[in-house]
Amino acid sequence: MAAAVMLGAAGCRSKSSAPGYRGPVIFGTVMYKARIALPPDAVLTMRLLDVTRRDAPAVVLTEKSVSGPGQPPLAFELPYPPEAVRPDRRTVVEARIEVAGRTRFYSPTAHVVTTETVMQPQEIWVEPAP
């Protein structure tokens, strides 16, 4: 199992804004179809969740927020602990865009990340919040 984690982490980017961080990073883009520009005070929040147990709330493995992310496609890098993505867990990436403290866009479907896909660029689509 440790070998699978190491293989999964080997291809990940190891660049992070955290000083001294040398661990794996999930990377990719967040996009939406709406023809709406984001204001400068928008906040993009990315979370890696463990949703293995269906009878329990999701466990937040890591979270990162970026203020003023620009316009779509929004590039992201989400550092995570190497042991977070394992074959025996179901892990998903969640994206949310907030403006003035209110959710404007969110990812309505689970974006599953596995040991095989974690090293590839992730493409997360978000939809307008209800």
Give the predicted meaning of each segment.
Residues 24-33:
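A short, amphipathic beta-strand motif
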Residues 1-10:
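Sec-dependent bacterial lipoprotein signal peptides
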Residues 73-75, 113-130:
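Extracellular beta-sheet/turn segments enriched in Thr/Pro/Gly and aliphatic residues
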Residues 52-85:
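Tryptophan-paired
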